[in-house]
Regions:
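A feature for loop-to-transmembrane-helix boundaries and adjacent hydrophobic helices
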Residues: 1-203
């Protein structure tokens, strides 16, 4: 049984808190950027840079908006400017994903290519980024697994029940970050019909 001392704040600089979740998002985008720049030959360097910049912007804005409206709407009502207080923490994965998709859709229109053409070329390199984000979920004590009595179960300090749970975030980090990555590389080795690769990713 593991009892981790998980502090969501990695570095505290006065009033500025640098959180593990934010660092894992940074690691995610850095890894995806490197992989796309190194291995995706259908996008030039400028396109890859634009893709990463606007995707990161979409992730931050979408992630923050998703967190506020789904988990902290009372805070927004009392202080609408709190939506910009990113340093206080609070990013929603699903909101961030939606923000990235909107950014990619806008870029596809700007480049004169079809949305799923772009998605097919990006999707194989996204899984490692998902793995990093799941590690951030673990550090934040989010998405807790089911209670268990296995030897590698985890008691999260923030869990009000205080029971041993599956470290589901780590399972997802392995499944989404490694297994899915290898699978996506396998199916993307040969030319596929449009949306075939991104369709497999969504499934």
């Amino acid at each position: 049984m593991l009892i981790p001392e998980l502090d969501p704040v990695a570095i505290q600089l006065g009033p500025l808190a640098i959180r593990w979740y934010g660092l894992t998002w940074l690691a995610a985008f850095s890894t995806i950027y490197f992989l796309i720049k190194r291995y995706q030959k259908d996008l030039n360097v400028e396109q890859v840079s634009d893709l990463m910049f606007y995707s990161l912007l979409g992730a931050i804005l979408g992630g923050r908006a998703g967190y506020i409206f789904f988990y902290s709407i009372e805070q927004f009502i009392s202080n609408p400017l709190s939506i910009f207080f990113i340093w206080q923490g609070g990013l929603s994965f699903h909101g961030g994903l939606l923000g990235v998709l909107i950014a990619c859709f806008w870029l596809s229109k700007s480049w004169g290519v079809q949305f799923f053409w772009l998605m097919d070329r990006v999707a194989p390199f996204v899984p490692p980024g998902l793995g990093f984000v799941r590690l951030g979920n673990f550090m934040n004590s989010e998405l807790l697994g089911r209670p268990t009595d296995i030897s590698w179960g985890v008691i999260f300090p923030s869990d009000p029940l205080g029971v041993t749970r599956h470290p589901s975030q780590l399972y997802q980090a392995f499944g989404e970050g490694i297994v899915l990555f290898l699978y996506m590389l396998l199916i993307s080795r040969n030319s596929k019909p449009k949306m075939n690769i991104s369709g497999h990713f969504l499934l």
